[in-house]
Regions:
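Extracellular beta-strand/beta-solenoid scaffold signature
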Residues: 122-126, 148-156, 172-180, 201-214, ...
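Surface-exposed or secretory-pathway low-complexity segments enriched in glycine-proline
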Residues: 481-521, 548-552, 567-569, 574-583, ...
């Protein structure tokens, strides 16, 4: 079907060379915003070549004359007079007094530079409006319902061109989580768009929606994103829109996954006639507990909705396995026109579906410092659990969700904003956005702020090279030394992956025997940049993802964070059926020493470790008696980046001796039951009158043995007793 090409009459003309389809002209910029930027907004310049602003506190303000405005994120935007890059000297949560409006062009907000646990915005929206060339990376935006008057989106891009959002986590909006309207040349990639508040405080009622996209003369690209736990609009398309929807993962939608508006719903702004275009390629849709339309991915609203589809997987059976299939046009409903070819020049890469699925979960969202909210979302998608939510609060019990009655309506409350570590930013003497240790290692002058805009061989400035390094997984290695890296912690905390490492540059890398740590060894006398590659195998599905590039800075300063070390543990012994207790000890060689956190490296049933104290407890199953078991534990520090170490514990599990039971008669109706065994295990005494049906009469874990129990056994018939170990 190609006749539709003649109906396009609008033009967008910018830049110096163009791709053309029909009468629509679209600029193709040769320099991506950063390595890995794709799609319509990939050419955004951001703050390239401009000044640098440091966010030094988590405050916000209302009045433009407020003396506390200096050092805030809001003032970093408001005071920009030209290209600017905003970096962070503090991590934590910023409670917005009102919507944070990004209305300045040529601006980069580099959330990946925040120390500690990164940056979260809450209470109000992040709005990018009336701007061009904006880059926003590695932020969390979780407004919630703290402000009873708030009815907005989490993130809204409106009347903009050349904007890219990368690795942004958005949730708990009252309207849509992330919307783009009246804009063109916008990319939303590697973002997690999750848990819009369904029955909240919107004046239209239930409004748990993902994205509203409409009114733009150019192209929008949504690539490699997660949509999870929205009632609908995953996304919703309006008039005058061309959307590349590629390699996204949709999970647990409610009434509808995605759909298009129609002539009537978008009538106010479609005087020229309703039209939209959708390229729906390489997506995965998985129905969840809240899904009511498990077999439909997208519903068209008019014949002027033109759809091209290719290689999409739909898993609607809710059987707990990842076994989606491509049902072709069968997953599309409503009214629309099919396209046999991509409706405009294709520039966005398409990843194989299973690899795209894993990459979204492995490295998507604000994954550099993945908080407990995103970790919980990850587990709900992996385990095919979770639910739509209505409000943010603290459940009274130790759980993630709680149903409460509010004004006669049952609402699902979700656990709210986690506390975030502020961290400590590295020294930056010239305040050019690049730490001193970085500048020294790569041959820049830490006392000359002008070198931040020096162009490199790949077309990026020196500052952009640093920002791009910080945006991916990264480690620091000492000169003439080595560093051990825990890949599990570095790459998002996803259990159930087997790692593979590949050769990189300026160093050698080896996967250690525990399968999750690598050792990188720097070449003798070298300082500067290196890297290595990591791929992963998901053990549950057999699918592979990667490789992912891990950047290494070989430093000439003492900026490296040394890993902690465990104190030796002797051979441990425990009786089966009892609890092994041991306190782990570790030290940190850094000055000053970092705070240490202990954890279980390889999960075992009944095994736990207190994070702050290292107190280990393991309730040993009776069935393991007479065996030798291995436990794996780990410790990590609070440095930047966090370093860790693992330790193997060997446990000899002694078998429980067979207990003995004796019955001494006291008188005609009373007996004394005597139990001989060992302290610790649970014993079960059972009674029978026919040696076939046995009934438990007592379960005990006596403090001392032998243990005596008085039995009254009425009736003339025989009674039999036996003893066994509780399972």
């Amino acid at each position: 079907m190609t006749a539709w090409l003649g109906c396009l009459t609008k033009k967008l003309v910018v830049g110096c060379w163009f791709w053309v389809w029909s009468d629509v002209v679209w600029e193709a910029r040769s320099q991506p915003a950063f390595p890995g930027a794709v799609g319509a907004g990939a050419g955004s310049r951001g703050g390239r070549g401009g000044d640098v602003y440091y966010v030094t506190n988590l405050a916000d303000y209302v009045s433009a004359s407020d003396p506390k405005r200096f050092g805030t994120l809001r003032y970093g935007v408001a005071s920009a007079t030209g290209p600017r890059t905003i970096v962070f000297a503090v991590g934590g949560t910023i409670t917005l007094s009102n919507d944070l409006r990004i209305n300045k062009s040529q601006l980069t907000i580099a959330g990946q530079t925040a120390p500690g646990d990164g940056i979260t915005l809450r209470r109000r929206s992040l709005i990018v409006s009336d701007a061009r060339d904006v880059v926003i990376r590695h932020l969390r935006v979780r407004p919630g319902d703290l402000d009873p008057t708030f009815e907005g989106d989490g993130v809204w891009v409106v009347r903009c061109t050349n904007v890219i959002l990368d690795h942004v986590s958005v949730s708990w909006s009252v309207d849509e989580c992330l919307s783009v309207t009246h804009s063109s040349g916008v990319t939303v990639q590697r973002c997690w768009i999750t848990e819009s508040l369904n029955v909240s405080q919107h004046d239209k009622g239930a409004h748990g929606y993902g994205s509203l996209l409409r009114y733009g003369d150019g192209v929008l690209t949504f690539y490699g994103n997660l949509y999870a736990h929205h009632n609908s609009r995953n996304p919703r398309l309006g008039d005058r829109l061309r959307l590349e929807f590629i390699n996204n993962l949709l999970y647990n939608w409610g009434s509808r996954a995605g759909y298009s508006g129609d002539q009537s719903s978008d009538l106010a702004d479609n005087l020229g006639g309703f039209t939209n275009w959708l390229a729906y390629v390489g997506n995965v849709l998985v129905a969840g507990p809240s899904t009511r339309t498990p077999q439909t991915a997208f519903q068209g609203g008019a014949t002027n909705t033109y759809i091209f589809r290719q290689d999409n997987w739909l898993d609607g059976n809710r059987n707990g396995r990842w076994d989606g299939v491509d049902t072709g046009w069968g997953m599309f409903g409503g009214t629309y026109t099919r396209l046999a070819q991509w409706p405009w020049p294709m520039t966005t890469p398409v990843e194989e579906v299973s690899a795209a699925f894993l990459r979204i979960l492995w490295r998507g969202g604000a994954s550099g410092k993945r908080d407990s909210v995103d970790r919980r979302i990850l587990e709900t998608v992996r385990n095919q659990t979770g639910r739509l939510v209505d409000a943010v609060g603290e459940p009274t019990q130790d759980q993630d969700y709680e149903i409460r009655s509010v004004n006669g309506t049952h609402l699902v409350f979700v656990r709210g904003w986690p506390a975030l570590r502020a961290g400590e930013a590295p020294a930056d003497a010239d305040q050019d956005g690049m730490p001193d240790f970085w500048e020294l290692a790569v041959g820049l002058n830490p006392l000359d702020a002008r070198d931040r805009n020096r162009a490199g061989p790949e077309g990026y400035t020196a500052l952009e090279d640093y920002l791009n390094w910080r945006a991916g997984p990264w480690v620091i290695c000492p000169r003439n030394g080595s560093v051990v890296v825990d890949l599990h912690e570095l790459l998002g905390g996803w259990e159930g992956l087997a790692y593979e490492v590949g050769a990189g540059s300026n160093g050698t890398v080896t996967l250690l025997p525990d399968g999750r740590r690598v050792r990188f060894i720097a070449p003798s006398g070298f300082s500067g940049l290196g890297h290595f590659a990591v791929a992963a195998l998901d053990l549950a599905t057999g699918w592979r993802v990667g490789p992912e590039r891990v950047g290494v800075l070989v430093s000439i300063t003492n900026a490296v964070n040394e890993p902690p070390g465990f104190q030796s543990v002797p051979l441990l012994e425990v009786l089966a059926g009892t609890t092994l207790e041991w306190t782990l000890r570790a030290t940190d060689p850094d000055e000053p020493a970092q705070t240490l956190r202990f954890w279980v490296a390889v999960p075992r049933s009944g095994l736990s470790v207190e994070a702050g104290t290292g107190r280990l407890q393991w309730r040993v199953p009776v069935a393991l008696g007479g065996t030798i078991q291995t436990l794996w534990v780990a410790v990590s520090d609070s440095g930047e980046p966090s370093m860790s170490a693992t330790q193997q514990l060997t446990v000899v599990v002694r078998a429980v001796p067979v207990p003995r039971l004796a019955l001494d008669r006291k008188d005609e109706s009373e007996w004394i039951l005597r139990v001989d065994g060992v302290n610790g295990p649970d014993y079960v005494v059972e009674r029978s009158e026919d040696l076939v049906r046995w009934q438990e009469v007592v379960r005990t874990n006596p403090a001392t043995l032998p243990w005596l129990w008085r039995v009254r056994d009425p009736g003339p018939g025989p009674a039999f007793y036996r003893i066994r170990l509780a399972p």
